Swiss-Prot record:
This is Small ribosomal subunit protein uS7. It comes from the Bacteria. Keywords: Ribonucleoprotein, Ribosomal protein, RNA-binding, rRNA-binding, tRNA-binding. The lineage of its organism: Bacteria, Bacillati, Actinomycetota, Actinomycetes, Micrococcales. One of its GO terms (biological process) is translation. One of the primary rRNA binding proteins, it binds directly to 16S rRNA where it nucleates assembly of the head domain of the 30S subunit. Is located at the subunit interface close to the decoding center, probably blocks exit of the E-site tRNA. The keyword DNA repair does not apply. Part of the 30S ribosomal subunit. Contacts proteins S9 and S11.
């Protein structure tokens, strides 16, 4: 906890094309080595592919994908008397959004398609349909929290 008072959360600007904060966050996660224009080109091209394949608004498909990926529980390590327990805790909304976007980019990079545009578009479509590696990661996180429910009373 900081001594100077509460930390003010930075306001994320909307992206210029879709006027969406979610797209802006996704661009920030795709960004590597400070190449923001390249990250924007990748995300916008991927969203164009999503709109062609899904034949609906790409931002709504992205939001649906993030809703399917957003975790509600996670485990945190808690040391009690010489042993470490995995304690399930609820995830705050900002962290849940950040985790969903992070998982989406990580698992899209791990895909086998040729370009990052194709990988990101495919992962967004898979996540919006409730399948894919990103959704599996969320289910694994929930399964881990469920299996350690006995240690929930150690929550701090």
């Amino acid at each position: 906890m900081p001594r100077k008072g509460p930390v003010v959360r930075r306001e994320i600007p909307e992206d210029p094309v879709y006027s969406s904060r979610v797209v802006s966050q996704l661009i920030g996660r795709v960004l590597l080595s400070g190449k923001k224009s390249l990250a924007q080109r990748i995300v916008y091209s991927a969203l164009d592919k999503v709109s062609m394949k899904a034949s609906e608004d790409p931002v709504s498909v992205l939001r649906k994908a993030l809703d399917n990926v957003r975790p509600s529980l996670e485990v945190r390590s808690r040391r009690v008397g010489g042993s470490t327990y995995q304690v399930p805790v609820p995830v705050r909304s900002h962290r849940a959004d950040a985790l969903a976007i992070r998982w989406l980019t990580v698992y899209s990079r791990a895909r086998r398609e040729k370009s990052m545009v194709d990988r990101l578009a495919s992962e967004i479509l898979d996540a919006s349909n409730g399948v894919g590696a990103t959704v599996k990661c969320k289910e694994d996180t929930h399964r881990m929290a469920e299996s350690n429910r006995a240690f929930a009373h150690y929550r701090w």
